[in-house]
């Protein structure tokens, strides 16, 4: 049975972790969301989220976006390459409903899997 937990080891926790990804990222994006990824040596993927107040004013909307993104990652974690991912929310992401956001994330996860295999 595959474990679908979301332990601390699967999160980017420090500014150093985020900076590592921002230095040489592989990008996959839509007009509302961008996923930056960089290969790591840990053998499993990790995720970090940035949802700025500038783009999503209300806290409950920012929390909804982060919750759906974490859930999408949690369900796909065993299919993803061993990369550190940073999800960057952009202007207009607040207008996406739950289904549209989930579909956009699935598309971007698939694109990152292809990018990792190609490199």
UniProtKB/Swiss-Prot annotation:
One annotated GO molecular function: tRNA binding
This protein's source sits in the domain of life called Bacteria
GO cellular component terms, semicolon-separated = ribonuclease P complex
Protein keywords: Endonuclease, Hydrolase, Nuclease, RNA-binding, tRNA processing
Q: What is catalysed by this protein? A: Endonucleolytic cleavage of RNA, removing 5'-extranucleotides from tRNA precursor
Biological-process GO terms, alphabetical: tRNA 5'-leader removal
* Enzyme Commission number, as recorded: 3.1.26.5
Which HAMAP family does UniProt cross-reference here?
RNase_P
Under the subunit heading, UniProt states: Consists of a catalytic RNA component (M1 or rnpB) and a protein subunit.
Q: Which family does it belong to?
A: Belongs to the RnpA family.
Say what the protein does.
RNaseP catalyzes the removal of the 5'-leader sequence from pre-tRNA to produce the mature 5'-terminus. It can also cleave other RNA substrates such as 4.5S RNA. The protein component plays an auxiliary but essential role in vivo by binding to the 5'-leader sequence and broadening the substrate specificity of the ribozyme.
Looking up PANTHER family in the UniProt record yields: RIBONUCLEASE P PROTEIN COMPONENT (PTHR33992:SF1)
The record ties this protein, via NCBIfam families, to: rnpA (TIGR00188)
Q: What is this protein called?
A: Ribonuclease P protein component
| Species this protein is from | Erwinia tasmaniensis (strain DSM 17950 / CFBP 7177 / CIP 109463 / NCPPB 4357 / Et1/99)
Organism lineage string: Bacteria, Pseudomonadati, Pseudomonadota, Gammaproteobacteria, Enterobacterales
């Amino acid at each position: 049975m595959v474990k679908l937990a979301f332990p601390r080891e699967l999160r980017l926790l420090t500014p150093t972790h985020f900076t590592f990804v921002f230095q040489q990222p592989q990008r996959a994006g839509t007009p509302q969301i961008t996923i930056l990824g960089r290969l790591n040596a840990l053998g499993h993927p990790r995720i970090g989220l940035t949802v700025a107040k500038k783009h999503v004013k209300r806290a409950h909307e920012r929390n909804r976006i982060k919750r759906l993104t974490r859930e999408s990652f949690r369900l796909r974690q065993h299919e993803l390459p061993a990369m550190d991912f940073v999800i960057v929310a952009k202007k207009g992401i607040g207008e996406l409903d739950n289904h549209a956001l989930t579909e956009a994330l699935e598309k971007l996860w698939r694109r990152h899997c292809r990018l990792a295999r190609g490199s």
